[in-house]
Swiss-Prot record:
Residues 358-401 are annotated as: Disordered. Keywords: DNA damage, DNA repair. SUPFAM superfamilies: ATPase domain of HSP90 chaperone/DNA topoisomerase II/histidine kinase (SSF55874), DNA mismatch repair protein MutL (SSF118116), Ribosomal protein S5 domain 2-like (SSF54211). The keyword Plastid does not apply. This protein is involved in the repair of mismatches in DNA. It is required for dam-dependent methyl-directed DNA mismatch repair. May act as a 'molecular matchmaker', a protein that promotes the formation of a stable complex between two or more DNA-binding proteins in an ATP-dependent manner without itself being part of a final effector complex. The keyword DNA damage applies. This is DNA mismatch repair protein MutL. One of its GO terms (molecular function) is mismatched DNA binding. It holds the Pfam family MutL_C. It comes from Klebsiella pneumoniae (strain 342).
């Protein structure tokens, strides 16, 4: 067969194979054209699931008579004119393929009128060469597109269409997604002459939540957490469902938009899933409605034929931006952790440590907590304190319950009265003084946060939480050289007062030694780097608390700041297992060998089994 140019109808039908998958694809393309035309009202009429009729009527700007024939031609569009336009697309459509493709597999009629014209005109294409006929018609300002008998001339495609109910369900889903993208547009959906959906235009935030509840359901609206997150040209807004109340029905609500364009992007979904993975069960999925705004030059939408996917020029930056935004609003929903039972490693008590241990409802909020509140992102509920070493324990799916049940049995067996706390942290029981190389062998985990150790024939309980705090303090305390600073992919910018600016300037040298790089300007401070132990923390809360702590100090000692940070970091473990405990003790023995020889108060407690054994003998 010789090489030849394909007839226009055949070429359009080939293109339609990518653009027109089913009736819902037609609705999507035509409604997006209406939105690009500035429509504020769109009426959608469907018959027999879209197989018989799809009619889209809008009150947009309309199409001039001289451009009607071009509108049905391939690669004819008013939305881009140069390569520069293609590299910064702000419209929903831009290829100029939709109308030509649809008209090649259905009987399409285009009727339109502009505000400058006194009459409307109607265009339709027919025949092998897709010749366009234009004739006068009656129509208000705007455009109406009628698509009759979809796939009438491609029987093979028509056989793949599902039932009327299924096809209309896909159309309904497309309209739902569009209604969530454009709150300012009224959208009416009719099927077989019956009104199915009416989404009235809204503007205010409260009314937006009303439409959100109408589309996503009252259950999602009740547990939705609002997100308002921004960095440079990146903005993330929307709602994510509280993982504590996520159900299989809610997990079906996963709507994401990039510059107003509905997307199913794997990078975005992965970032959201990663932010929620510690709060959801293995078989659960997050529920969200999120809007990402980004510089059009930084995203390529000319990737997927149906424009369902995009490619970000800085994909890692976008991924981490979304991850941090979702993670921050979820962490603010954690209940305030209980106060730690152990005293700090040093007898000195500082008021800011009360913050990390958990909010005290009977005390006034400290300046550090007030500072954190100023910097917290918007949430639909009152945020709870997320500091402290047990911040992750509130999530029910963090660890299975076996460890807690096992710990309860051991507590009953080893119910030994606690020995009086020594006056000095350096003082330790005499029977522990001989151990200089290792804490001993880990036998099991008790209560989720203590390890039962065997130490030369005797037993002892070690607080893993306290051991982790000592390890962090050792990691944060600089030696002969400053702690290595880890640059943040997205620098954190916070507003500060004049007093806080002066405190940061005075503490600049100490913070640099600790691996914290700051830059201050007139009203803000920008955190550019932090030490490794702080990388996985919620810096939106921790840094304001640190600034509040520094503002209360008269002198800035590196050791005291490192100690404060160690006590205020959120524990990475909600409930410990054997492998984690063994790894932690190995690190403590390597970095803090003095703790093995002279355990401080609150770290290690000998267990006396004699009373339990005597009780058994008495029986």
């Amino acid at each position: 067969m010789p090489i030849q140019v394909l007839p226009p109808q055949l070429a359009n039908q080939i293109a339609a194979g990518e653009v027109v998958e089913r009736p819902a694809s037609v609705v999507k393309e035509l409604v997006e054209n209406s939105l690009d035309a500035g429509a504020t009202r769109i009426d959608i009429d469907i018959e027999r699931g879209g197989a018989k009729l799809i009619r889209i009527r809008d009150n947009g700007s309309g199409i001039k008579k001289d451009e009607l024939a071009l509108a049905l031609a391939r690669h004819a569009t008013s939305k881009i004119a140069s390569l520069d336009d293609l590299e910064a697309i702000i419209s929903l459509g831009f290829r100029g393929e939709a109308l030509a493709s649809i008209s090649s597999v259905a009987r399409l009629t285009l009727t339109s009128r502009t505000a400058e014209q006194q009459e409307a005109w109607q265009a339709y294409a027919e025949g092998r060469d897709q010749a366009v006929t234009v004739k006068p018609a009656a129509h208000p300002v705007g455009t109406t597109l009628e698509v009759l008998d979809l796939f009438y001339n491609t029987p093979a495609r028509r056989k793949f269409m599902r039932t009327e109910k299924t096809e209309f369900g896909h159309i309904d889903e497309v309209v739902r997604r569009i209604a969530l993208a454009r709150f300012d547009v009224t959208i009416n959906l009719n099927h077989n002459g019956k009104v199915i959906r009416q989404y009235r235009a809204v503007a205010q935030d409260g009314q937006r939540e009303r439409r959100l509840g109408t589309i996503c359901g009252a259950a999602f609206l009740e547990h939705a957490l609002a997100i308002e997150w921004q960095h440079g040209d990146l903005t993330l807004r929307g709602w994510v469902a509280d993982p504590l109340h996520t159900t299989p029905a809610l997990a079906e609500i996963q709507y994401c938009y990039v510059n107003g364009r509905m997307m199913r992007d794997r990078l975005i979904n992965h970032a959201i899933r990663q932010a929620c993975e510690d709060k959801l069960g293995a078989d659960q999925q997050p529920a969200f409605v999120l809007y990402l705004e980004i510089d059009p030059h930084q995203v390529d939408v000319n990737v997927h034929p149906a424009k369902h996917e995009v490619r970000f020029h800085q994909s890692r930056l976008v991924h981490d931006f979304i991850y941090q935004g979702v993670l921050s609003v979820l962490q603010q929903q954690l209940d305030a952790p209980l106060a730690e039972k152990d005293d700090p490693p040093t007898p000195r008590q500082m008021p800011e440590n009360r913050i990390a241990a958990g909010g005290n409802q009977f005390a006034r909020p400290s300046e550090a907590r007030e500072a954190a509140t100023r910097f917290s992102i918007t949430s639909s509920r009152e945020p709870a304190a997320s500091g402290g070493s047990s911040g992750g324990a509130s999530w029910p799916h963090a660890q299975p319950g076996y460890q807690k049940q096992q710990g309860a049995l051991y507590r009953q067996l080893l119910d030994t009265p606690a020995a009086p706390r020594p006056a000095q942290p350096s003082a330790a029981p005499a029977e522990l003084a001989g151990h200089s190389q290792s804490f001993g062998r880990v036998l099991t985990i008790v209560g989720g946060d203590c390890a039962l150790l065997e130490r030369e024939g005797s037993l002892a309980l070690l607080s893993l939480t306290v051991a982790e705090r000592w390890l962090r303090q050792a990691q944060l305390t600089p030696g002969t050289e400053a702690v290595c600073a880890q640059p943040l992919l997205i620098p954190l910018r916070l507003k500060v007062t004049e007093g806080e600016k002066r405190a940061l300037a005075a503490a600049q040298s100490a913070l640099t030694q600790l691996g914290i790089e700051l830059h201050t300007d007139a009203l803000h401070v920008t955190v550019r780097a932090v030490p490794l132990p702080l990388r996985q923390q919620n810096l939106q809360i921790l840094i304001p608390e640190l600034i509040g702590y520094l503002a209360q100090q008269n002198a800035f000692d590196v050791g005291n700041i490192a100690q404060w940070m160690a006590r205020n970091l959120t524990s990475e473990q909600a409930s410990w297992n054997m492998a984690q405990a063994i790894a932690l003790l190995a690190d403590v023995e390597r970095l803090c060998p003095q703790l093995v020889k002279t355990p401080p108060g609150g770290l290690l407690q000998p267990v006396d089994l004699h009373s339990a054994m005597n009780a058994l003998k008495d029986e």
